[in-house]
Amino acid sequence: MSVIFRLCIALCVLYVAVLALLYFFQERLIFFPSKLESNHDFIFDRPFEEIRLDADGTWISGLKFLAQSRDGGQIYGDARDGNGERKAKNGAAIFFHGNAGNLQGWGKYARHFTDLGYDFYLFDYRGYGKSGGEIGSQERLYADADAMMQWVLRDCDAGEIAVVGHSLGSGLAARAAQKYGAKRLILIAPYFSLEELAREKMPFVPKFLIKYKIPTFEFVGGFSGPVTIFHGEHDELIGVDNSRRLLKFLKSGDKIYELNAGHNDILGLSELWEKLAQRLSE
């Protein structure tokens, strides 16, 4: 057996081994959860309620921040939810967060919605924060998103919900908005599809080995409500071209804003929140 032939065999075996590792451990390349102790006390500067809900064999940890005025007074109309509690005057916003951290860190963005008269719902995916279990498939991730939306639907109608997704959460948000008929959809640093993003990062991996497809473009194209997209021009993780490719799936009145930001600093831009507030008021 020639040296070249042996080398080819060795390279093929190595390639197959690498692909096997990527298939069975790809969650470690996508999800970066930060766990919290079950007795962790959340601390925020505004009123909130802690949520624990069942989702496909495990439990999901969540928070509901109550709508309030800038001077701290709660903003509620006369309508009431299924529990007899008065509803926030502008309805609810649910935020599907990115692939790292947990509720303690993501909760700081609640004020951008509660100050506008929205009750703000935020959940950790399984394996994040206080949530149990672990993500092992796209189906589990979808089950988490469904459980989150169904919880919010206990408090208000779908037509009163603004669905917001950042990074990893953008595809889940688009799916939830389309599936449940939400009022509006807001995407921040979205991917065109998670499968294509993975292929962009790892072009040597065959498509059939990528477990997480999440075709954001399909969900955006099937959503009838207003869509707003924000993307950093200098995004180094999910390039702005992902949002530009979503353009052909948008309707009249939908908007894309390209901002002077990267991936990890876009949520710190006051310009983003100012434009988001304008869109929510339309």
What is each stretch, according to the model?
Residues 182, 186-196, 216, 261:
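Active-site nucleophile loop of the alpha/beta-hydrolase fold
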Residues 262-272:
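Catalytic histidine-centered segment of alpha/beta-hydrolase-like enzymes
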Residues 223-224, 229-235:
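Short beta-strand/loop motif that positions the catalytic acidic residue
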Residues 7-54, 72, 81:
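An N-terminal hydrophobic leader/cap segment in hydrolases
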Residues 234-238, 264-265:
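Acidic catalytic loop of the alpha/beta-hydrolase fold
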Residues 157-167:
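Alpha/beta-hydrolase fold nucleophile elbow
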Residues 60-68, 84-151:
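Membrane-embedded segments
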Residues 109, 216, 225, 239-248:
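Short alpha-helix in the alpha/beta-hydrolase fold that links the catalytic acid
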